[in-house]
């Protein structure tokens, strides 16, 4: 788990992210012991074999998770079935953020209800194998961990159980300008016991392909009002990844004093171990 960042508007030193002492890729049975502070659509792509299974069915035995499943607030079918906005769309440029900077989304746009979260990157043109980067979202409770496996949103689990988050699909190449992957968020539908939405990007099969984030220049995340297409903020990462294979790009989190309000922090923190490592520190069983 990890604690909330400083109040919106301040800049921290990113020390609330601390790596756990357990071995990357091994599920941590005791998250309390190791504190960790702080997309064009395709619905027909076959699931990738061997890595994390989709969320268990709603009929999973009671008590399987440390917290109860979220209230059943499933959205109408097709509410998020539309394609994501065109690449690079949005009115204006929004506030340009630097690493560790925070911004109150609710103050910047008092009528904000739904977000478009666009993530993009360019890749070097000379690697031996094509790049495949994946955007993922972790829905965290107050303890800094997912409440259940369904709170991990990725290419094989595109919609959250409460219907508030929809991943528009995996871009296998990262080609072209603008957004490479898009996530839609209905803030009003996020379960009340979810306090943080962590947006990360990982490299698929980095060891096999001999790739890392040092080969991925010009990555960014942008936040826009989905209903008006107005860009609220954007964070451009510059050589943040080094030899690492997973990166937390930013987080959308509730205001502790007013849970109806939301803020964003530009994180830009990279880690070794790829997607498995992120799953470990946020309590997702990736075995």
From Swiss-Prot:
Superkingdom: Eukaryota
The keyword Nucleotide-binding is annotated on this UniProt entry: yes
UniProt keywords, alphabetically: cAMP, cAMP-binding, Nucleotide-binding, Nucleus, Repeat
C- repeats: 60-68, 75-83
Region (Disordered): 1-94
Alphabetized GO MF terms: cAMP binding; pre-mRNA binding
Location of this chain's protein in the cell: Nucleus
Record CDD domains: TerD_like
Pfam name, any one: TerD
PANTHER family registered for this protein in UniProt: CAMP-BINDING PROTEIN 1-RELATED
The name this protein goes by in its record: cAMP-binding protein 2
Species whose genome carries this gene: Dictyostelium discoideum
Gene: capB
């Amino acid at each position: 788990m990890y604690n909330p960042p400083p109040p919106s508007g301040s800049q921290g030193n990113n020390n609330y992210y601390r790596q756990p002492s357990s071995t990357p890729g091994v599920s941590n049975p005791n998250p309390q012991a190791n504190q960790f502070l702080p997309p064009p659509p395709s619905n027909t792509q076959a699931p990738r074999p061997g890595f994390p299974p989709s969320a268990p069915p709603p009929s999973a035995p009671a008590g399987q998770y440390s917290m109860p499943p979220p209230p059943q607030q499933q959205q109408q079918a097709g509410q998020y079935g539309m394609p994501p906005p065109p690449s690079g769309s949005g009115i204006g440029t929004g506030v340009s953020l630097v690493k560790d900077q925070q911004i109150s989304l609710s103050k910047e746009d008092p009528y904000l209800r739904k977000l478009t979260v666009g993530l993009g990157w360019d890749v070097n043109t000379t690697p031996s194998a094509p790049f495949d980067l994946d955007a993922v979202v972790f829905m965290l409770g107050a303890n800094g961990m997912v409440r259940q496996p369904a709170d991990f949103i990725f290419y094989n689990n595109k919609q959250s159980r409460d219907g508030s988050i929809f991943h528009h699909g995996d871009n296998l190449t990262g080609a072209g300008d603008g957004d490479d992957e898009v996530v839609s968020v209905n803030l009003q539908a996020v379960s009340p016991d979810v306090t943080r939405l962590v947006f990360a990007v990982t490299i698929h099969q980095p060891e096999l392909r001999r790739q890392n984030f040092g080969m991925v220049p010009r990555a960014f995340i942008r936040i826009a009002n989905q209903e008006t297409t107005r860009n609220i903020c954007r964070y451009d990462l510059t050589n943040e990844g080094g030899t690492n294979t997973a990166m937390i790009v930013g987080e959308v989190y509730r205001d502790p004093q007013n849970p109806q309000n939301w803020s964003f922090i530009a994180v830009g923190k990279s880690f070794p171990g790829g997607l498995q490592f992120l799953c470990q520190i946020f309590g997702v069983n990736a075995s």
